């Protein structure tokens, strides 16, 4: 997520034409894939817009599902291309790509296809990914829940330092927003948060409780973004947990989400 923020603000060379030349070369798929690995996904996303349909379809096959998903997550700023690119994939292929994306990024893509195609794609997604997407869609456009990501780390407050680190590593395989670790009690109620650095430097003999910030801010999913945007701007945290009415963590609102909301205001 942070890479996405940086790619929007840091000035850099336009590599799209270089990438196009690589893709239009007569090199093997393996060689092209190796050359593409030297470029940032945002640059490849820019290059895709310059390709003809046949070359794009070849590119999707070269990239594979995971890499295509990373690249498609950078298309949200150019929605006019999204529907065309998605229809170049079969429904099953497109659904596979969406499953590999963060749910909020998948929603950004789905928002830019027809209602019929949206429902078809969602119906072909695996249950966990589908549930995350449907959760976000269950909130109105102006509610926090509609802007949240389901990419977060959550652990129990009764773990030892060693157990907490082990749980972090396990969850990080699927969730890469690791800078802030959310904490719940035995009833799955939000308890607080831990800064990643504090967990890394903690000694095994310390109690997890000693590094939990129980006053860490949170918001409710049904809150209006417009009504709490000023409060959110005051926080410098990478992310803030989003709770349901039972104070269970269902998502997170990230710094990039807040920046986008401020820009819209």
What do the predicted segments below correspond to?
Residues 1-265:
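Hydrophobic packing positions in regular secondary-structure scaffolds
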């Amino acid at each position: 997520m942070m890479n996405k923020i940086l790619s929007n603000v840091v000035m850099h060379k336009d590599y799209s034409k270089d990438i196009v030349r690589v893709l239009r070369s007569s090199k093997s798929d393996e060689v092209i894939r190796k050359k593409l690995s030297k470029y940032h996904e945002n640059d490849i996303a820019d290059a895709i817009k310059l390709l003809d349909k046949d070359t794009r379809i070849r590119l999707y096959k070269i990239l594979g599902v995971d890499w295509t998903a990373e690249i498609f997550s950078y298309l949200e700023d150019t929605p006019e291309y999204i529907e065309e690119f998605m229809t170049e994939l079969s429904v099953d292929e497109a659904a596979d790509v969406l499953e590999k994306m963060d749910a909020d990024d998948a929603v950004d893509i789905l928002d830019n296809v027809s209602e019929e195609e949206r429902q078809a794609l969602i119906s072909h997604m695996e249950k966990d990914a589908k549930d995350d997407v449907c959760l976000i869609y269950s909130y109105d456009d102006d509610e926090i829940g509609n802007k949240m990501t389901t990419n977060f780390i959550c652990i129990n407050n009764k773990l030892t330092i060693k157990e907490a680190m082990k749980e972090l590593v396990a969850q990080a395989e699927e969730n890469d927003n690791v800078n802030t670790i959310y904490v719940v009690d035995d009833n799955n109620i939000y308890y607080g948060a831990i800064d990643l650095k504090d967990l890394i430097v903690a000694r095994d003999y310390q109690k997890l409780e000693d590094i939990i910030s129980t006053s860490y801010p949170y918001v409710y999913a049904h809150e209006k973004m417009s009504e709490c945007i000023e409060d959110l701007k005051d926080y410098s945290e990478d992310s803030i947990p989003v709770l349901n009415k039972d104070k269970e963590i269902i998502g997170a609102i990230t710094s990039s989400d807040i920046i986008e909301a401020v820009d819209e205001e």
